[in-house]
Amino acid sequence: MSFDLQLIIESLPVMLMGIGITFKLLVISGVLGLLLAICLLLMRISGLWYLNVPAQIYIYVFRGTPILVQIFIVYYGLPQFESVRESTFWPILREPTGCAILALSLNTGAYVSEILRGGVLGVDKGVLEAGSALGMSAHQKFVYITTPIATRLALPAYSNDVISLLKLSLIHI
């Protein structure tokens, strides 16, 4: 067995195409998952049970099932419903890439929402009391105090989740 440089040169365009698809999945799923996670975070910290409970159920289901099962359900299960095949989303869900983006976004949203919630809960109460002493409203405290500190606290775990998403995006290929 010898090292065949010609085989590597011939395979390079296919490998580069795979890298492009992987990064496309990573960016699109990461952004959609982050937007979903922010919505879930706001539902979780709202203090309203009718927002908190559905978010908890969603997070419990998507964190409790393997991503491969979720991809199979999206790719093989959703087309079983006539309403899905007749919807405006069918051209996207008909393709494997669209199904992978949907499944990865839903899964990432569940994990990232818990990462962000941990960051929000990690903000020291004394800092929020200082904001109240300065006359800040609850909205101002959340925007100017909680969000920057929570972002800093959640960033290491979020970067780990982005790396996990990169690895999971290879399932599609």
Regions found by a protein language model. Give the residues of each.
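Transmembrane alpha-helices and adjacent helix-loop boundaries
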Residues: 1-172
